[in-house]
């Protein structure tokens, strides 16, 4: 089936869609023929993407505000007459820090965005999705399953998103609504760049991120977008699924360890582009 017809005539809401993974997902659904609602607090970024993507509209929404979420869904159904898919992508990754340096208030705020925002949109969208026998795709993360050094609040909130996905999949199966999640690994996005800039050595942080995957590079937002379109369309017998889009990082054997076992190294002064494989030299 041609990519432009895979989800033709369907209506998709993508939160946190103004940039990064969310923008990649929005682009992929537009390419598949869907009508896409770009949802974000960032009006400038959302409007810019709306101008870029034919078949997309921007609606400003803060997913931590239930009244905003209600308005988002009401406006979407009023404009398009239906709702077929919701992608809960809005979220944040705070800077890494030891647990003793975190605060309960900061944790609560992260829960409001990463978990309760997803919960609220799911709850309010289900009446529409039951009518269309649609589906929800929640964006979790690899570290929700394997943990993250000095990233306890983030890993905890995203791990809860995965658990929420599985529980909702059971509840909604009686209505023919599927609920799945995607757990990305290192995806090269503006957020990744911002977090790397906070590291003592940003170039080394980027290199380490790229080398964490057996495929030897970071992923791209378009690759997460392709996974989302697959879950919404062809994956009609999948529900409660956690789909890892990680370059194999969860296997625990990135190329740096492999090259070392062969007596090779990544050229230390060379930081490869995050989405391409690095140059290799000999230790000898």
Curated annotation (Swiss-Prot):
Gene name, Swiss-Prot/TrEMBL: HSD17B14
Residues involved in NAD(+) binding: 19, 21, 40-41, 62-63, 89, 154, 158, 187, 189, 191
Similarity annotation: Belongs to the short-chain dehydrogenases/reductases (SDR) family.
Record note on pH: Optimum pH is 8.5 to 10.0.
Enzyme nomenclature, EC number: 1.1.1.122
BP GO terms, sorted: L-fucose catabolic process; steroid catabolic process
GO cellular component: cytosol
Pfam families given in the database record: adh_short_C2 (PF13561)
Protein name, per record: L-fucose dehydrogenase
Known catalytic reactions: L-fucose + NAD(+) = L-fucono-1,5-lactone + NADH + H(+); D-arabinose + NAD(+) = D-arabinono-1,5-lactone + NADH + H(+); L-galactose + NAD(+) = L-galactono-1,5-lactone + NADH + H(+)
Function: Catalyzes the NAD(+)-dependent oxidation of L-fucose, yielding L-fucono-1,5-lactone, which rapidly converts spontaneously to L-fucone-1,4-lactone. Can also act on D-arabinose and L-galactose, with lower catalytic efficiency. Does not use NADPH. May be the initial enzyme of the putative L-fucose degradation pathway in mammals.
Source superkingdom: Eukaryota
Pathway recorded for this protein: Carbohydrate degradation; L-fucose degradation
Keywords: Carbohydrate metabolism, Fucose metabolism, NAD, Oxidoreductase
One example GO MF annotation: estradiol 17-beta-dehydrogenase [NAD(P)+] activity
Group of enzyme by EC: oxidoreductase
